[in-house]
């Protein structure tokens, strides 16, 4: 294996030098998303320096994808993280970032323990785009920035308005974001004492209870059960979910 690599890697390096920066970025993304992503480190060690040397050839979006792919592969690349952080401070480069990319950036820098590098730039950007956030972006943001309560509440309040039109998948993501961001307050055992957002989510579950798939119901139960703050809401879920609820809670208990 080692002797073969000694022959192959210089040729690979030579081949990679002929590709465009965007194509190299796409290769890295493919490696990160491959199911057997115990990606060959030798190939990555050849590909990543090439990507770094072509940094200025690609857009900020591709550079974000590069650090995202490396983070997926559990690789922290300080120089690339710094260069992306520097570019994010550049108003013209950062102006076209979508909420999806903003959430992706937050995920990358939190996972790499480097949120301080970008927080001053990203928080105002996210705030000014709050109205454009969809449920999936909101859920990802709430998972990585649960401490940014004011910001998350701003997005949740805007999404709350569209709750009646949400499909189940979007509702699950919205609910996940509300649970992670601890936005469902107050939570009382009786209906009258609950906050409007809490009651609206429970009401959605009641109205759509027959349309939820079993695995979706299980996700809601898992989510609430594992949240110290909202564990009590499991009892407020629709009665028709009781059998699934009991099975799921038994399974959680058995797993210990």
Locate each region found by the language model.
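Eukaryotic RNA-binding helical-repeat scaffolds
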Residues: 1-256
């Amino acid at each position: 294996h080692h002797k073969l690599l000694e022959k192959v890697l210089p040729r690979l390096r030579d081949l990679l030098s002929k590709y465009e920066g965007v194509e190299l970025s796409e290769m890295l993304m493919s490696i990160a998303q491959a199911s057997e992503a115990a990606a060959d480190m030798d190939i990555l060690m050849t590909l990543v320096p090439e990507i770094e040397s072509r940094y200025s050839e690609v857009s900020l979006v591709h550079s974000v994808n590069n650090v995202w792919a490396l983070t997926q592969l559990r690789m922290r690349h300080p120089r690339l993280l710094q260069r992306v952080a520097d570019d994010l401070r550049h108003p013209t480069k950062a102006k076209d970032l979508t909420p999806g990319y903003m959430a992706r950036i937050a995920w990358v820098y939190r996972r790499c323990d480097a949120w301080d590098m970008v927080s001053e730039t990203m928080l105002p950007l996210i705030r000014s785009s709050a109205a454009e956030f969809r449920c999936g972006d909101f859920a990802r943001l709430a998972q990585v920035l649960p401490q940014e309560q004011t910001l998350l509440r701003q997005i949740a309040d805007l999404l709350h308005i569209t709750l009646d039109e949400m499909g189940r998948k979007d509702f699950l993501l919205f609910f996940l974001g509300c649970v992670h961001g601890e936005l469902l307050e107050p939570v009382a055992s009786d209906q009258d004492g609950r906050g409007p957002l809490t009651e609206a989510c429970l009401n959605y579950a009641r109205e759509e209870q027959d349309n939820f798939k079993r695995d979706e119901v299980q996700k809601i139960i898992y989510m609430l059960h594992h949240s110290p703050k909202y564990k009590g809401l499991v009892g407020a879920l629709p009665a028709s979910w009781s059998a699934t609820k009991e099975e799921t809670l038994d399974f959680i208990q058995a797993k210990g």
